[in-house]
Amino acid sequence: YMRLGRKIIAYMVTRTFSGLLYEMDLRLRPNGQSGLLVSSESAFEQYQQQNAWTWEHQALIRARFVAGCDRVAKRFKQIRHAVLKQSRDSHALRKEVIEMREKMRSTLLNQKPGYFDLKHGVGGIVDIEFIVQFGVLENANNHPALLVYTDNIRLLDTLNKIGFLSDSQQKGLNEAYQAYRKASHHASLAENPKMVLVEEVEHHVQLVTSVWDEMIING
């Protein structure tokens, strides 16, 4: 099965004339590159409950079942819900989210004078994602509605409905996220770096940064 898995992966990441067929990052699996390509249900549950880092629970928020039998889909949903609705210490959670964000930015930020890194820049896509993920992990224990969706747009809406985000914050983050994603898609199609001129997104950056500071740094 290991050989079969690697063969499937090789097909999926084939580069065509139109670009990469499908982007896959298997480093995010349990135990990273040293872990098995596929885990049993019980092994996956045990890892998520006992060994996973906070950033892995952040990733689990976006996880969804893609293909397979209904029984496995149902079991995955049960495990995901059980992990994400755990009661968490807000101070410790905030500290870990901030540390991971700083670590990512220090290694992945693409810097060029006059340009803004759509994904990793201060006030960019990842900051919005981390705000959403912090909100879900902090509140899912009391608000199961946060476990229904996996996409950021509907999660922003749900975070607004439970009172975590104000109307203006939800609207601003939604608009910024969609603007960033649109620009990112255009860059991908042109096979260009995912960067734009600072002045093109300055108002979005200021909004996202202010929400980050209020909800994460000073929360």
Positions of PLM-derived features:
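A nucleotide- and high-energy phosphate-metabolite-utilizing enzyme signature
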Residues: Y1-G219
